[in-house]
Amino acid sequence: MANRKIVVALGGNAILSKDASAEAQQAALRETAKSLVSLVKENEKLIITHGNGPQVGNLLLQQMIGSTKSNPAMPIDTAVSMTEGSIGYWMQNAMDDVLEDEGIDKSAATVVTQVEVDANDSAFQNPSKPIGPFYEKEDINKIRELHPEYIYVEDAGRGYRRVVPSPKPVNVREYQVINSLVDNNVIPISVGGGGVPVVREGNHLIGCEAVIDKDFASEKLAELIKADLLIILTAVDNVYINFNKPDQKKLENVTVEELENYINENQFAKGSMLPKVQAAINFVNNGCGEAVVTSLKNINNFLQKGSGTIITK
């Protein structure tokens, strides 16, 4: 089944390990590119999306520490675009090198992507997405003097973290550009970190203080470009029920209805596996094709043996 249009969503944590240096992240992405090129070898049309959770948190911390009246910190939408550019550069450089090594006549290109959200989304009244580092309570009081608009919540006894809105994506502004790149034998890298969050004001798109979940944004892109397959990569080869319990069970071929029942049983952790499963359900329900949740190292096994968690109607 070659020549399929396949969106592959990479997690931000797959890019950043314990070493947050640019060199270490580039090295990690070179290994990622070696795994992804197997899809290209099978004559599939690859579209890469990625997270930026650790990276944008680190960048916002740098911005805050260095902020002055004459050189103020950049807002979240701009920080997201900055990480889209940096991670996209690393990813396309790694992909181009691997494609060259394999003798494949293709190249990669990064698209800084604006993802539209609804200005009336209830998420704007209920910030819930944690970003950045953990703080002690006394540190929060100092930060609030400089940024009274920031909202911090306690996170499971580990300290306090800033939370921001995480609205659902309703459109990907550049999806036609991305489709055009695919049609011209280019591997697009887009929707980095869920894309730059924008809201519509009349005929204009305006950046907003939010972070869009990259799995939902990847699904919206896959839907708009009429992808045949959405692959959401995570740390494990399969989705599990009763995860990390003696009776844990991996899911291999599963229907949307079965997954929805598992969601009702609270089988999937919020902020971890749950959004991946929900994004996969959305894609399949929209009649686009199948969705797969698996790990990067399992890509070859998925291609050859169909292993991983495969979601169908």
UniProtKB/Swiss-Prot annotation:
Subcellular locations according to the entry: Cytoplasm
Keywords: Arginine metabolism, ATP-binding, Cytoplasm, Kinase, Nucleotide-binding, Transferase
EC number, as in UniProt: 2.7.2.2
A GO molecular-function annotation: carbamate kinase activity
Catalytic reaction equation(s): hydrogencarbonate + NH4(+) + ATP = carbamoyl phosphate + ADP + H2O + H(+)
One of the GO BP terms on file: arginine deiminase pathway
CDD domains cross-referenced by the UniProt entry: AAK_CK
Pfam families: AA_kinase
GO cellular component, one term: cytosol
Keyword Ribonucleoprotein: no
Pathway linked to the protein: Metabolic intermediate metabolism; carbamoyl phosphate degradation; CO(2) and NH(3) from carbamoyl phosphate: step 1/1
Chief location of this protein within or outside the cell: cytoplasm
Family per similarity comment: Belongs to the carbamate kinase family.
Matching PANTHER family: CARBAMATE KINASE, CARBAMATE KINASE-RELATED
Protein name, per record: Carbamate kinase
Source organism phylogeny: Bacteria, Bacillati, Bacillota, Bacilli, Lactobacillales
Gene encoding the protein: arcC
